């Protein structure tokens, strides 16, 4: 089973290293140092903590699973610069077009040349050969990055499994709130591990609504996938995150689900 074989390492924010079948996959690369301010016409993001390792310490990456390219807490400047060194960047269809065409984000410089980005629509699946002779399937899953009706750009999640296997897949939620799209993932897939983006991100321009899952919503995900291990991501390191480690521990304890949590160990570079 893929969940028994996969090794997950935490790097920071929504950045995690997944080692499976000889492949090294990286989610939402963010490697800029602490203290960075990212100013757009609509808002400013403030990064508070550094990544566990810097981009040059991570080693070779085969593929990047990028939930979206247009927010700097999911793809920052240093993360952008490593994208042309990987075999493919799997992301939204809109994001793939921007990256392949070197289109700049608002207030940012263009993407580097040489990126091979693949757009993945909701429920579409691509196949990637592993280095041990198997086939890894990656399926796009829906996300809603905040309250209904807002235009915050497309975001995708992912379900990973080996071809011909249907049990105990890995679900990477991406930046989403709890809504019917997440529930549909539960109807379509048997999941054994959830990399769950939490943080209850909030920005003044949006008002009191949250842009990513609250801890309370994440508990709904844990109950939806009743036997899955829950690995939190996207819960620390930014000023606009309103919930973090303490809230996760408190609410999961109150819900009787503390034993479902597994904190991914930080990645340590090989000597």
Identify the function of each model-found stretch.
Residues 23-25, 62-63, 88, 136, ...:
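Structural motif
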Residues 1-49, 247, 251, 259, ...:
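Zn-dependent metallo-beta-lactamase
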Residues 1-3, 90-167, 250-271:
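Metallo-beta-lactamase
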Residues 4, 11-21, 127-192, 209, ...:
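Catalytic core of the metallo-beta-lactamase
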Residues 75-86, 101-104, 240-250:
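Metal-dependent catalytic neighborhoods of phosphoester/phosphodiester hydrolases
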Residues 18, 28, 68, 76, ...:
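Divalent metal-coordination and catalytic microenvironments
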């Amino acid at each position: 089973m893929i969940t028994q074989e996969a090794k997950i390492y935490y790097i920071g924010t929504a950045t995690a290293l997944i080692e499976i079948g000889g492949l090294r996959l990286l989610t939402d690369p963010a490697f800029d140092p602490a203290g960075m301010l990212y100013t757009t016409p609509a808002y400013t993001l403030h990064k508070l903590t550094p990544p566990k390792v810097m981009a040059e310490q991570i080693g070779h990456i085969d593929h990047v699973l990028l939930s979206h390219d247009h927010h700097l807490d999911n793809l920052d400047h240093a993360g952008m610069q490593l994208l042309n060194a990987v075999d493919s960047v799997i992301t939204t269809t809109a994001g793939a077009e921007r990256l392949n065409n070197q289109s700049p984000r608002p207030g940012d410089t263009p993407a580097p040349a040489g990126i091979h980005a693949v757009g993945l629509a909701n429920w579409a699946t691509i196949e990637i050969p592993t280095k041990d002779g198997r086939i890894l399937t990656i399926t796009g899953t829906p996300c809603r990055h905040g309250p209904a009706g807002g235009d915050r750009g497309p975001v995708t999640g992912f379900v990973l499994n080996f071809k011909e296997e249907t049990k105990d897949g890995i679900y990477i939620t991406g930046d989403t709130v709890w809504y019917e799209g997440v529930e549909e993932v539960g109807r379509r897939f048997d999941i054994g591990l959830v990399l769950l983006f939490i943080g209850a991100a909030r920005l003044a321009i949006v008002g009191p609504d949250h842009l990513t899952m609250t801890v309370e919503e994440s508990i709904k995900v844990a109950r939806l996938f009743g036997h899955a291990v829950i690995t939190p991501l996207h819960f620390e390191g930014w000023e606009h995150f309103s919930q973090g480690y303490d809230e996760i521990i408190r609410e999961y304890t109150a819900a009787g689900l503390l034993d479902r949590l597994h904190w991914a160990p930080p990645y340590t570079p090989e000597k």
